[in-house]
Amino acid sequence: MARSIDPAPRAVRGFVPARTDEERFLMRHVEDLARAAEGRGIARYSGFLSDREQDLARAALNRADVPESDHHFEGGWPGAERKLLCLEPEGCYPASPLCCVKLTCRTLSGAALPGHKDYLGSLMGLELRREALGDIVLPADTPGTAYVFALETAGELICRELLQVGRTEVTTTLLSLDEVPEFPQA
């Protein structure tokens, strides 16, 4: 009986199998971003990723042998759920495409304030893709105010086009990440 002298293949730590074609596409896209960042020595960024997509991205980076020092996930604030994958090889100039838009409601006292669904619905009404939008934070200490983390291009579009959320008029202010207040952890 013939026997192989090769040792049994080792399991790859951190492997997460893709379940759908979209997930397989995401993993290939992350590998392509990693190759481009490493090959050209320039920073590359993904769109905003959900928790599952972040796990798949980590698995793809693991499979592509990208060192942990060359990538991180950034959501704009410490408690962020939706985050960008930032591939920043050593020696590159990082220029994160992340920004924050402050939305302030202009309502009469006693009027109902919009909720998270209202904000998300209004942003989707601008025909923005979900990958362009990160977390929407509604701080409890400042009712009528929301902070939307987004890609720079989406943030600029929000500032130009968003006039109301639900039936409530809003004013928009584009903030740098340094200007974002600290939010209490939920």
Q: What name fits each language-model region?
A:
Residues A2-A186:
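Non-catalytic terminal extensions of ATP-dependent helicases
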